[in-house]
Amino acid sequence: MRFDGAQAGWRETPRPGCTLDQRDWLTRGGSLTAHLARLGRVNVRVTREAVDRPWFDEPDALASSPRAPMWVREVILSVDGMPYVAAHSIAPLAASKGVWQAMRRLRTRPLAELLYSDPQVERSALVSRRVIAGHPLYALASHALLGARAPHAFVARRSVFQRHGKPLMVTECMLPALWRHLDAHGDGPRSVGSHGGA
């Protein structure tokens, strides 16, 4: 399964200028939270669950109208108390009451409990981009820094999951603390106290 995010600046190959760590994490398959769990204890903090309109660069990927109501879930993934990822997940409202209804009951459990344990779920290719001020994801990521100064740009990735033909898109924005950890410690196994995905 594929979707074309190029018109909105998303691309399958990370842009030139990304570090090796960034290229690695933007293209890793599987559950992002499972990868984070290799770095330390993972905590999922839900910051918003609501009915909303899609962002400007989301309708095409979801094959939906720009005004179609969506169910939105936003979380911060922290490792040992430090925010590493801001995640934004979105599904058509009708699908969130149907094939994706379990996403409404997750609370602080990771979304990956739904995405990676069900053989009926298919995933698109990962796409990525730099995120600068003016994109709603930049505001979401900046807020996750708890007052720390935001960088000029973040890097983020997204993919679309489908179950019975109904889409759920997950966008994951990596925060500066993740890159600092990798610079200092690499990403080898440490305590694994959590599993799952954004």
Swiss-Prot record:
One of its GO terms (cellular component) is cytosol. InterPro entries: Chorismate--pyruvate_lyase (IPR007440), Chorismate_lyase_/UTRA_dom_sf (IPR028978). Keywords: Cytoplasm, Lyase, Pyruvate, Ubiquinone biosynthesis. This is Probable chorismate pyruvate-lyase. HAMAP family: UbiC (MF_01632). GO terms for biological process: pyruvate biosynthetic process; ubiquinone biosynthetic process. Belongs to the UbiC family. It catalyses: chorismate = 4-hydroxybenzoate + pyruvate. It is an enzyme of class 4 (lyase). One of its GO terms (molecular function) is chorismate lyase activity. Removes the pyruvyl group from chorismate, with concomitant aromatization of the ring, to provide 4-hydroxybenzoate (4HB) for the ubiquinone pathway. Transmembrane segments: none annotated. Substrate binds at residues 73, 111, 172. It comes from Burkholderia cenocepacia (strain HI2424). SUPFAM superfamilies: Chorismate lyase-like. Its EC number is 4.1.3.40. It comes from the Bacteria. Disulfide bonds: none annotated. The keyword RNA-binding does not apply. It is found in: Cytoplasm. Pathway: Cofactor biosynthesis; ubiquinone biosynthesis.
